[in-house]
Swiss-Prot record:
Gene: hemL
Lineage: Archaea, Thermoproteota, Thermoprotei, Thermoproteales, Thermoproteaceae
One Pfam family named in its UniProt record: Aminotran_3
Catalysis: reaction(s): (S)-4-amino-5-oxopentanoate = 5-aminolevulinate
Protein name (record): Glutamate-1-semialdehyde 2,1-aminomutase
EC number(s) per entry: 5.4.3.8
Keywords on record: Cytoplasm, Isomerase, Porphyrin biosynthesis, Pyridoxal phosphate
Organism of derivation: Pyrobaculum arsenaticum (strain DSM 13514 / JCM 11321 / PZ6)
Similarity annotation: Belongs to the class-III pyridoxal-phosphate-dependent aminotransferase family. HemL subfamily.
Pathway annotation from the record: Porphyrin-containing compound metabolism; protoporphyrin-IX biosynthesis; 5-aminolevulinate from L-glutamyl-tRNA(Glu): step 2/2
Length: 423
């Protein structure tokens, strides 16, 4: 069994905790992927994890594949400037005007780590505020009350992070203006930056009140701190302008990843030119990397952006998520389940609970065991939902009406079976 072999060479048998599927005896084994489908050791599955949001056009999209193949013919790494990376950056700036200059790195973790370092270098202050349940990667600055896999596995604050580092990270409740203002007051003139997911996508799906995001912008500006929007998930998924475009909030710095790379490793941090000009070699805040602006990744990303600029991928993906959200709500209601469904653009998640979901505490109060049981049953019916209530389901441009109907028919059977099994 491949998973048993994997356990001999990888901690827990995987190379990222979210892949371990804690409620199942083994991880899924991928064989291939195309359009909305994953081909695995459990057969063909309709995919709603979509590489945790990294795929927005659909798996193995022909335009992206063709662009990457053409790049591979020319070579795959030079450690020199390329035309593609400039064109890619210009396209990002065109759609996200707040990103006046940027540095292209390799992961979302690198992007947020460098954005925080830059904010500290610019402000000459050391404390940051993050929010309960927001996930900004796996570096020491932010592994305090984190979401995503850290929440799934019950280790939101990682071992191995020095207390001297933890002291520089203040955690405030998400979507709570009064608590945020109190945290800013307590930190005082040591506050370098506030980093936030403008839509929380790593603790399930939490859509904040507009007043909360407005308060982040106004208060950071008032005290001379920088506002960092972590749009690794929402960037180029909630539209070409990301969450900041949707909500009309202009941050000082933005981090990007996932969808903007078309499924290839990428991370970006960027923002106001006067801040970004502090990054080496034009300034004293150091960042470097052999694989920065990797030719294959930026080529794939440019192909994705050109496709997204037509608008059609967003329309298809958003419509699919809307139909799925309404369909799940209808199925659950008819079968007597208390289920809350949250949806924005091509992101959705549902929770077994009464009442709304507006904070991480609301997510914690939902029935995680019920979600995991449904996930397991749905797999048997050919549907791969995101494997934790602390993650998000994603649709893509490949999730057509026919695929959605196929999914809802399978989920109806899954919910019926769940009802039978729980009595």
């Amino acid at each position: 069994m491949l998973f048993e072999r994997a356990r001999q060479v990888f901690p827990g048998g995987v190379n990222s905790p979210a892949r371990a599927l804690k409620h199942l005896p083994s991880s899924l084994v991928a064989r291939a992927a195309s359009g909305p489908y994953l081909y695995t050791d459990r057969g063909r599955l309709v995919d709603y994890c979509m590489a945790f949001g990294a795929i927005i056009l659909g798996h193995a999209h022909p335009r992206v594949k063709r662009a990457v193949e053409e790049q591979l013919e020319r070579g795959w790494i030079y450690a020199l400037l390329t035309e593609q990376e400039v064109e890619f950056a210009e396209a990002i700036r065109r759609h996200m005007p707040s990103v006046e200059k940027m540095r292209i790195v390799n992961t979302g973790t690198e992007a947020t780590m460098n954005a925080i370092r830059l904010a500290r270098g610019y402000t000459k202050r050391d404390v940051i505020i993050k929010f309960d349940g927001n996930f900004h990667g796996s570096h020491d600055y932010v592994l305090v009350k984190a979401g995503s896999g850290a929440a799934t596995w019950g280790i939101p604050t990682s071992a191995g992070v020095p207390q001297d580092v933890v002291k520089l990270t203040v955690v405030a409740p998400y979507n709570d203006v009064d608590a945020f203002l109190k945290a800013v007051k307590e930190v005082g003139d040591r506050l370098a930056a506030v980093i936030a997911e403008p839509v929380a996508g790593n603790y399930g799906l939490i859509i904040p009140d507009a007043e909360f995001l407005k308060a982040l912008r106004e208060e950071t500006k008032r005290v001379g701190a920088l506002l960092i929007f972590d749009e690794v998930i929402t960037g180029f998924r909630l539209g070409l302008g990301g969450a900041q475009g949707r909500f009309g909030i202009r941050p000082d710095l933005t981090t990007l990843g996932k969808a903007v790379g078309g499924g290839f490793p990428i991370g970006i941090f960027g923002g106001r030119a006067e801040v970004m000009d502090l990054v080496a070699p034009s300034g004293p805040v150091y960042n470097a990397g052999t694989y920065n602006a990797h030719p294959v990744s930026v080529t794939a990303g440019l192909a994705v952006l050109k496709e997204l600029e037509t608008g059609e991928p967003f329309r298809t993906a958003d419509e699919a998520a809307e139909r799925l959200a309404k369909g799940i709500e209808d199925i659950a209601g008819r079968l007597g389940f208390d289920v809350v469904v949250k949806k924005i653009a091509s992101m959705f998640q549902f929770y077994f609970k009464k009442g709304d979901v507006k904070t991480p505490q609301d997510v914690r109060e939902s029935n995680e065991k019920m979600y995991l049981k449904l996930h397991e049953i749905a797999l048997r019916h050919g549907v791969y939902l995101t494997p934790s209530q602390f993650e998000v389901n994603f649709t893509s441009a490949a999730h057509t009406r026919e695929v959605v109907e196929e999914t809802l028919a399978a989920l109806e059977k899954a919910f019926q079976q769940l009802k039978t099994e729980i009595g």
